[in-house]
């Protein structure tokens, strides 16, 4: 279906959002801009926008096939996708399978510890406050979501983790941790939104433990473009 792109509604760190001729559909346009540490570090990863767009769409289509509702509608070009217009629930959901990043620092443990079961964390999606960690009781107190919505978000998040770990294991990648965002459609349905990419996931090569994600930019390791391309190459080869 053809969607006429209208005015820009929003511009974030990694994407722009445009209205369309359909009031229930918006167009997401992925940028090459890269940020870390809540926007304190800024740069560019050449080609990132196109890779993240295609990878997100590929994975969301697979998740839909397995029963996880998403905002995905139609891939329009290498950088643009039509998605359902949603009201984002201001909770970032972090699932962790292996210790790394802020988890390792917060609890004083080494990176690379494989957990017996995945952990789940929430953070309040608020740049001005630095996206502070919160629990479900905080979310209820602040009326960010209802108990039923929180329960459903947790159910979907763990389901996404199980499925993504399987997808990544087939291509020799460990899914270390990742961030999800959910939104509500016009009729109140909770769906997976935002993106699934090396911007939002920690991905390590299963054999070498080489980092294949935004940590390469975040930690000034170099090779971010090549890492993103490698994940995409493996994922597309698994079709």
Across the structure, where does each feature detected by a protein language model lie?
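A long amphipathic alpha-helix within ATP-dependent nucleotide-binding catalytic cores
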Residues: 144-176
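Conserved metal-phosphate-binding beta-hairpin within the catalytic cores
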Residues: 95, 175-194
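Short histidine-centered catalytic/ligand-binding loop motif
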Residues: 40-50, 133-156
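A short glycine-rich, hydrophobically flanked beta-strand micro-motif that places a catalytic Asp/Glu
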Residues: 74-79, 168-184
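Phosphate-binding core of ATP-grasp and ATP-grasp-like enzymes
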Residues: 113, 118-130, 161-172, 197-202
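An exposed, glycine/acidic-rich loop-and-rim segment of catalytic or binding clefts
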Residues: 113, 123-131, 138-146, 223, ...
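Active-site loop/lid in soluble adenylation, ligation, and acyl-transfer enzymes
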Residues: 2-124, 235
